[in-house]
């Protein structure tokens, strides 16, 4: 390899298949390549750190089941008549004694049969959110639903899940045993997407699984805040000590991560990750590209509200790396610098390989290794959606359960 100077600046020729390609390093594409290589290098180091973090999270084995911890399960529900029965049936089959847990379904202004379905289960108390709030429009009905549930609960430990989820039989028993043993204030637990063979569902399952692996590693290593409201547990004491959702109640989403950060600030040693197959909550995928983008835009909308600067740094790194990887092939084709595409493919290959190294043990834990064949094929689409969802999460709006939110 030889470097020289040309009219456009430094030229780096690359020999490939008997052709000599020259890329002006100080051209737009050359600068983007340098930035992308730098960002990708940092990203790979971070993923290796996550990989080590995942490996050292202990697999929790429930040796002595505890049936004395008082638990309240809070389920916010809006128009969930199709999904709610499966969740409540799975809760009905818990090995944990019903004497020690309470189930509250908070009906968030449903226009379907959600409330009637919930009321058919004798162990469920259904509360109507409209009985507890005024007629004023809110920006976060879900936080208000959870807050209402907590105010009407009796449990020492609050457990939250979503109405479109299914929980395993030993879910509560394992949570109670872990809580009894370690006395955490906030417990983060695994969630998996229950997908079919449809490409959009496989894509979601892979994307979500990567987030779950990062969640476990970051929580255990105390690198930054990350969790999912479909499977959380926290003490009533901690929720009340941080004054609940006060200060974040005007933000549309964030009933999970924003609350986690508030509790972590007051109880830095009280945040634990419960890694056990007994507590993997299965959640339903969305069934269209439009619904998927809408969901991810909703998730991205809270990004600039995080007080945790560490997660902000990670999000910026990932977002701008994907922006660079999207711009490089576009600019190379526009400018006619076809050789840059070879570098782009190399960057994609490195990114994909490092991500697969990280994902393999995570997929093993979630019993989703057969899905990994699709991961390289999904890479370009993942880059595109990350850029779109990140931008619209900041500057656009989204629809949630028939409500338009900005």
Task: Give the positions of each predicted feature.
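Short, acidic, metal-binding catalytic loop of nucleotide-sugar glycosyltransferases
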Residues: 89-100
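Cell-envelope/extracellular polymer assembly enzymes that use nucleotide-activated donors
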Residues: 69-72, 102, 258
């Amino acid at each position: 390899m030889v470097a020289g100077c040309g009219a456009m600046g430094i030229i780096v020729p690359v020999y490939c298949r008997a052709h000599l390609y020259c890329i002006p390093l100080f051209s737009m594409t050359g600068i983007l390549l340098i930035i992308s290589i730098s960002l990708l290098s940092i990203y790979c180091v971070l993923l290796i750190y996550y990989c080590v973090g995942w490996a050292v999270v202990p697999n929790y084995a429930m040796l002595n089941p505890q049936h004395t911890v008082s638990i309240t399960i809070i389920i916010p529900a809006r128009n969930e008549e199709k999904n709610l029965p499966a969740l409540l049936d799975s809760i009905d089959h818990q090995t944990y004694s019903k004497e020690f847990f309470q189930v509250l379904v908070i009906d968030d202004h449903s226009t379907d049969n959600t409330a009637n379905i919930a009321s058919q289960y004798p162990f469920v108390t259904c509360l109507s959110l409209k009985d507890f709030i005024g007629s004023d429009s809110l920006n976060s009905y879900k936080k208000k639903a959870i807050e209402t549930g907590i105010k009407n609960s009796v449990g020492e430990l609050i457990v939250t899940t979503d109405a479109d989820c299914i929980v395993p039989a030993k879910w509560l028993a394992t949570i109670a045993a872990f809580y009894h043993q370690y006395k955490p204030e906030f417990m983060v637990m695994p969630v998996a997407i229950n997908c079919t063979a449809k490409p959009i569902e496989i894509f979601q399952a892979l994307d979500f699984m990567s987030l779950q692996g990062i969640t476990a590693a970051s929580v255990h290593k105390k690198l930054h805040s990350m969790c999912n409201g479909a499977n959380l547990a926290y003490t009533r004491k901690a929720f009340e000590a941080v004054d609940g959702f006060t200060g974040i109640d005007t933000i549309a989403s964030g009933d999970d991560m924003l609350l986690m950060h508030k509790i972590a600030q007051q109880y830095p040693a009280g945040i634990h990750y419960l890694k056990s197959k007994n507590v993997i909550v299965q959640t339903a995928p969305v069934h269209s590209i439009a619904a998927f983008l809408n969901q991810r835009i909703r998730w991205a909308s809270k990004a600039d509200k995080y007080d945790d600067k560490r997660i902000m740094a990670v999000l910026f790194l990932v977002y701008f790396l994907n922006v660079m990887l999207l711009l490089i092939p576009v600019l190379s084709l526009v400018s006619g610098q076809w050789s840059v595409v070879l570098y782009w493919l190399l960057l994609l290959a490195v990114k994909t390989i490092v991500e697969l190294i990280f994902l393999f043990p995570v997929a093993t834990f979630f019993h989703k290794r057969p899905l990994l064949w699709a991961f390289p094929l999904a890479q370009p689409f993942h880059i595109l959606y990350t850029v779109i969802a990140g931008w619209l999460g900041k500057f656009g709006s989204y629809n949630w359960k028939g409500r338009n939110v900005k």
